[in-house]
Amino acid sequence: MRERAAGYPLPPHGHHPNFVGAKEAAAALLAHPQVAAHRTLIVGADRALYPLRKLALAAGVVLYLPDQKREGWYFRVDDVAGANLKRSREVGEPKLRPEGATAAVLACVAVGPGGGRLSKGYGWGWNGLPALGLPTYTLAHRRMLLNPLPCPPDSWVRLIGLPGEVTECPTSETGSLAP
């Protein structure tokens, strides 16, 4: 917070931190060819992902947002108003499965250059979405990049959207993320 890198809500304790430059990081990630090809995404409900939700919906991408009150449920949203979580209940359609989703964007607390993602340790998406087998991406401020990570990652991401750029994470020959 002393560096003025954290954004609302403050303090960032207890949730994935929002950060200054999140909109630029979202724009960079959405413009990356690996992400731009997806027309339906699962996107976390974290404040740091609000700019990504808004930009994606404005570009015609369909989003599935996790229902914060019913575990395992999503809201299918195609209206820009649904980028705001309070409005997603009004404009979204409740779904048990994210039908047609081809990738996911999850928030992080920290991420390593190799794609290891640390979450807040609980809640939706804390350990990624392994059961769905989808490529996963994240947004981060440069101060959230740690090498090495202080503990084993919760999950792995293929791309890290940073303000103004995207970092590609190494993959194995089979396309799965390198451990």
Regions found by a protein language model. Name each.
Residues 1-20, 24-39, 58-62, 71-179:
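Surface-exposed, charge/polar-rich loops and edge strands
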Residues 51-56:
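A short acidic, amphipathic alpha-helical/loop segment
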